UniProtKB/Swiss-Prot annotation:
Keywords: Sporulation, Toxin, Virulence. GO terms for biological process: sporulation resulting in formation of a cellular spore; symbiont-mediated killing of host cell. The gene is cry1Ga. It comes from the Bacteria. Belongs to the delta endotoxin family. Toxic segment of the protein is located in the N-terminus. CDD domains: delta_endotoxin_C (cd04085). GO terms for molecular function: signaling receptor binding; toxin activity. It comes from Bacillus thuringiensis. It holds the Pfam family Cry1Ac_dom-VII. This is Pesticidal crystal protein Cry1Ga. Promotes colloidosmotic lysis by binding to the midgut epithelial cells of insects. The lineage of its organism: Bacteria, Bacillati, Bacillota, Bacilli, Bacillales.
């Protein structure tokens, strides 16, 4: 009631306050959200290990009970709390995802129930597998939408529900997977996803809860409502996510939530209480339970009210006489005698208040608003009421903000009152408010620390009754379910009173959930006697945030028993330097009979090691066991706990080393671990210089290679090796295989009689399916191979033996090739080639193997014999054809030189003749492998013999031409330029000088030998009217010139010059190695008619190969890309006898455009 200035009472609920009305409406509308969330938390706390009943329960509580309207309430609740309204489209999108998940999960539950009724039925197994995958895909697709940017807080409660559903689903698959028919590799992948998602979802929820709370600012109704409502709908559920780890928690687990939430202050809605959080909210503390409250009463304007109080509590496990008396809240007024109230009941569980009803009176007097509490009733679960001042007409009720399930408080309550604070406004403002603030803890946080014999008992360390010096209590990060303890120096954390209900012969092991910036030792004492001491590793670096991944659950391997049913358990830490940080969340007591994760890891490693060998005596490896798989098994062994199974770990390590040695022995590749590339000319790996060898990482245990892309497909990135013929067996199939971390446009070849070829694209860590969730680094920078990794499904097809190209969806690859007869003299061998010829291409690969797969029988044997015969037939044909081509090429090369020593060119040998001879040399087939032109082919020796002589010819030719850069391949280097001229590259890949203006001139000073004779030879073309001139002269007189015209009339030249046609005619005796005025290259050098026109490479085989073709880049070696001049170019020359040691060459024109291809000044032979 409100008292006016005339002391007339006005009903409290008639106060005109919009914010109060909003929050009253909010509480009535959104009670369903808290009720549903509390029900889910209780279900998760009470549920056992997975069974069909768990999925059914989850469906009944959440996914089968909520529709679009209910899901909208989850969204609208947070919208009002943070004052951020989302659009109808965004709300509809979120609810559509949730209802879709509900439908998919319903079908999964039906399939699970059907399978449970008939678990051995293959159809039932297939259906539940299919429904699991569809639901899993739906969640994986939908969750990112619920975490969309700028809506993370608004969607937080529904994100939590979907995340919980996903973890439940993944746990089902790990737990039931073997009986569903999933492979062990599938199950391991699902378990890795499960643990990775627990971390991801926990961090997401804690982060956005804390950010949303911080954005609200100072204490207010909104702040307390957000803290309370989202603790119930988000953080309580998140705190139980770790229990989904079925291997860490394989039996029922008893968890406790020790966090505190606050109901709104019991004041009138129009009162503004802008106080700091520190004055209202409790600092982190050891958990306590109310024993009694002493309430003091004051009076204002003749109205008695709650003016102050004292709280007397006990910590966990403490009895009478061990009380904590908190400082006085408010004032110890004496308008009425103090009232002491305490909960009543027969047991500690009954002696707890789950509800508080209050009567608030408000009135205005002398211009000041008053809001006071004049009566409160506290209810236990048996409806026993403890009343402060008898009253009637209670008008506020905490059950509106913390509802119970159903109508029976004994089974439906979720929270108990744990403390009472006090709100007092300043007496110097116009508003006068005095009211209690109630804080509550979850019912799962029991009044005792009882350790059960048949479950894993988790006890948060804040349930200690004594805090040791140097230990502090800090606010939890959000996913721990409460506050945590911290030390920065050695010593004990605290003492816990524990109760044992089982026979004292029951053995337990202790685990600790901790985070630490240092390696350290934990120890435990029971009643002052040391029970365990063990080494524990650091989990984080100094300054790191307390994220989920910083915490680790680890324990002692030695089991123990309690000697007393009521014992004191102490935990401490030592063995580290000061100023480090050590945090403990909880202690776990595990019945010794339960299989620890370490035991599971040992069993898994033993199975993996034994599965490597063909028999129990480890004589031989299984054929399908890859070198990469052996490395992974080695990692499993290395990650075993030294504390738990040191001897077994050593034994398994020796077996894995033996397996690795067997793998090396059967691998026919030299240097499979990439100790070097190009180290030995005829052995090991050969490759392009841009390939890098990198040490092992979290993917590869040993060295691996990285192949980058290339800007020119004719100069690819490559890596190759030849398998010697001596290592091969007749009529046997061999397999190349390995592991690719990622690749794009990686081509893999195996070549013998033909080429087997695959193009492999493997998405890597940046793909939709990541290889690893993280790349953790050890304390010394080494890769942490014990951290969970997400790998591709190894059951997917990893070879494409019948196709030319294959886009892999597996990191494993294999390619096989068949060997027929072997010939050590011929030494055909097998070429192994990796190549990338695109700019975007790349690859990282390792663990390469080339090994014997099986002998060839039946059809495979007949096929390889047929292929071998075809290859030999074509090889013989190639030899005949090569003899003809070689003879002609050699004659062309020999004609360039004076003698067989090849040390002097013929006097009339010109550049065109050398190019023409080079082209004939390049007509020799199979000089290099068409797949990779750096690998010599069957005709490499004769090709390189002639090509060396061509190189000599070019060198001799360059040496006798005294004009520098006469072919303009280096632009205008060495030339003096006046006016505007250009050097252009024409479509025949030649550089030409273009003189477009009559005033332009290009010249070069050349040193010569006086008294010797020279030939000036110019190849040029004139466009338009006028003449182009190339002049040679000395300082005084002795001038000659060559003129070029576009006129068709016959020109008259000096006696010492010849025309192009005359010159060409004179060269016919050298079998026409030049270009005439109107004569093309093909006419002068057509194809030899003795060579078949339909000649194809000898490895071409349509039925058995993948279409091996001649390498189009092979012609680019040396001068093979030389093409004839276009029609219209003319070559002219003159003889010149200098009288001094310097001459000048000048190029110009009178009109039009003058195009010069080359200028030569050649010393005549003596």
């Amino acid at each position: 009631m409100e008292i006016s200035d005339q002391n007339q009472y006005i009903p409290y609920n008639c106060l005109n306050n919009p914010e109060s009305e909003i929050f009253n409406a909010r509480n009535s509308n959104f009670g369903l959200v808290s009720q549903v969330s509390s029900g889910l938390t209780r279900f998760l706390l009470e549920a056992a290990v997975p069974e069909a009943g768990f999925a059914l329960g989850l469906f009944d509580i959440i996914w089968g009970a909520l529709g679009v309207d209910q899901w909208s309430l989850f969204l609208r609740q947070i919208e009002q709390l943070i004052r951020q309204e989302i659009t109808e489209l965004e709300r509809n999108r979120a609810t559509a995802i949730l209802t879709g998940l509900s439908s998919s999960y319903n079908l999964y539950v039906e399939a699970l129930r059907e399978w449970e009724n008939d678990p051995n039925n293959p159809a039932s197994q297939e259906r539940v597998r299919t429904r699991f995958r569809l639901t899993d895909d739906a969640i994986v697709t939908g969750l990112p939408t619920l975490a969309i940017r700028n809506l993370e807080v608004v969607n937080l409660s529904v994100y939590t529900q979907a995340a919980n559903l996903h973890l439940s689903l993944l746990r089902d698959a790990v737990y039931f997977g073997e009986r569903w028919g999933l492979t062990q590799a599938n199950i391991e992948d699902l378990y890795t996803r499960l643990t990775s998602n627990i971390q991801e979802y926990s961090d997401h929820c804690a982060r956005w809860y804390n950010q949303g709370l911080n954005e609200i600012g100072g204490i207010s109704r909104r702040y307390l409502d957000f803290q309370r409502d989202l603790t119930i709908s988000v953080l309580d559920i998140v705190a139980l996510f770790p229990n989904y780890d079925i291997r860490t928690y394989p039996i029922p687990t008893q968890s406790q939530l020790t966090r505190e939430i606050y109901t709104s202050p019991v004041v009138a809605g129009n009162i503004n209480f802008g106080l700091s959080i520190a004055n209202v909210l409790r600092a982190p503390h050891l958990m306590d339970f109310i024993d009694r409250i002493v309430i003091y009463t004051n009076s204002v304007r003749s109205t008695p009210y709650w003016a102050g109080h004292e709280v007397i509590s006990r910590r966990t496990g403490q009895g009478q006489g061990n009380e904590i008396r908190f400082p006085l809240y408010g004032v110890a007024a004496n308008a009425e005698p103090p009232v002491t109230i305490r909960p009543t009941g027969f047991t500690d569980e009954q002696r707890q208040w789950y509800r508080a009803r209050s009567r608030v009176v408000s009135f205005r007097s002398s211009g000041q608003d008053f809001s006071l509490v004049d009566a409160v009733g506290f209810l236990t679960i048996f409806s026993a009421v403890s009343i402060y001042r008898n009253g009637f007409g209670f008008n506020t009720d905490t059950i509106d903000e913390i509802p119970i399930e159903g109508t029976d408080p004994f089974t439906g309550y979720s929270h108990r009152l744990c403390h009472v604070g006090f709100l007092a406004s300043s007496p110097f403002i116009s508003q006068y408010a005095r009211a209690p603030i109630f804080s509550w803890t979850h019912r799962s946080a029991t009044l005792t620390n009882t350790i059960a014999p048949d479950v894993i008992t988790q006890i948060p360390l804040v349930k200690a009754f004594n805090l040791h010096s140097g230990a502090t209590i800090v606010k939890g990060p959000g996913f721990t379910g409460g506050d945590i303890l911290r030390r920065t120096n050695v010593g004990s954390f605290g003492d816990m009173r524990v109760n044992i209900t089982a026979p004292l012969s029951q053995r337990y092991r202790v685990r600790i959930r901790y985070a630490s910036t240092t390696d350290l030792q934990f120890y435990t004492n029971i009643n002052g006697t040391t029970i365990n001491i063990g080494n524990f590793s650091s989990t984080m670096d100094s300054g790191d945030d307390l994220q989920y991944g910083r915490f680790r659950v680890a324990g002692f391997t030695t089991p123990f028993t309690f000697s007393d049913a009521n014992s004191t358990f102490t935990i401490g830490a030592f063995g580290f330097s000061p100023n480090n940080e050590v945090y403990i969340d909880r202690i776990e007591f595990v019945p010794a009979e339960v299989t620890f994760e370490a035991e599971y890891d040992l069993e898994k490693a033993q199975k993996a090691v034994n599965a490597l060998f063909t028999s129990s005596n480890q004589i031989g490896l299984k054929t399908d066991v890859t070198d990469y798989h052996i490395d992974k098994v080695s990692n499993l062994v290395e990650c075993l706990s030294d504390e738990f199974c040191l001897d077994e770990k050593r034994e398994l390590s020796e077996k894995v080393k033996h397996a690795k040695r067997l793998s090396d022995e059967r691998n026919l590749l030299q240097d499979p671990n990439f100790r070097g590339i190009n180290r030995q000319p005829d052995r090991g790996w050969r490759g392009s210089t841009d390939i890098t060898i990198q040490g092992g990482d979290d993917v590869f245990k040993e060295n691996y290679v990285t192949l980058p892309g290339t800007f020119d497909g004719c100069y690819p990135t490559y890596l190759y090796q030849k398998i010697d013929e001596s290592k091969l067996k007749v009529y046997t199939r061999y397999q190349l295989r390995g592991y690719i971390e990622d690749s794009q446009d990686l081509e893999i070849y195996l070549i013998r009689y033909n080429a087997k070829h695959e193009t492999v694209n493997v998405p890597g860590t940046g793909s939709l399916w990541p290889l690893s969730a993280q790349s953790p680094i050890g304390k010394c920078g080494e890769p942490n191979r014990c951290a969970p990794h997400l790998e591709w499904n190894p059951d997917l097809d990893c070879s494409c033996r019948n196709g030319e190209k294959c886009a892999h969806h597996s990191h494993h690859f294999s390619l096989d090739i068949d060997v027929g007869c072997t010939d050590l003299n011929e030494d055909l061998g097998v070429w192994v080639i990796f190549k990338i010829k695109t700019q975007d291409g790349h690859a990282r690969l390792g663990n390469l193997e080339f090994l014997e797969e099986k002998p060839l029988l039946g059809e495979a044997l007949a096929r390889v014999k047929r292929a071998e015969k075809k290859w030999r037939d074509k090889r013989e044909k190639l030899e005949l054809e090569t003899n003809i081509v070689y003879k002609e090429a050699k004659e062309s090369v020999d004609a360039l030189f004076v003698n067989s020593q090849y040390d002097q060119l013929q006097a009339d040998t010109n550049i065109a003749m050398i190019h023409a001879a080079d082209k004939r040399v390049h007509s020799i087939r199979e000089a290099y492998l068409p797949e990779l032109s750096v690998i010599p082919g069957v005709n490499a020796a004769i090709f390189e013999e002639l090509e060396g002589r061509i190189f000599t010819a070019f060198s001799l030719y360059d040496a006798r031409n005294v004009i520098k850069n006469g072919d303009f391949n280096n632009g205008l280097s060495c030339w003096n330029v006046k006016g505007h001229v250009d050097v252009e590259e024409q479509n025949n890949h030649r550089s030409v000088l273009v003189v477009p203006e009559w005033e332009a001139e290009v010249s070069q000073e050349v040193r010569v030998c006086p008294g010797r004779g020279y030939i000036l030879r110019v190849t040029a073309y004139k466009e338009g009217y006028g003449e182009g001139c190339v002049t040679i002269h000395e300082i005084e007189n002795n001038t000659d010139e060559l003129k070029f015209s576009n006129c068709v009339e016959e020109e008259v030249y000096p006696n010492n010059t010849v025309t192009c046609n005359d010159y060409t005619a004179n060269q016919e005796e050298y079998k026409g190695a030049y270009t005439s005025h109107n004569r093309g290259y093909d006419e002068a050098y057509g194809n030899n008619p003795s060579v078949p026109a339909d000649y194809t490479p000898v490895y071409e085989e349509k039925a058995y190969t993948d279409g091996r073709r001649e390498n189009p880049c092979e012609s680019n070696r040396g001068y093979g890309d030389y093409t004839p001049l276009p029609a219209g170019y003319v070559t002219k020359e003159l003889e010149y006898f200098p009288e001094t040691d310097k001459v000048w060459i000048e190029i110009g024109e009178t009109e039009g455009t003058f195009i010069v291809e080359s200028v030569e000044l050649l010393l005549m032979e003596e």
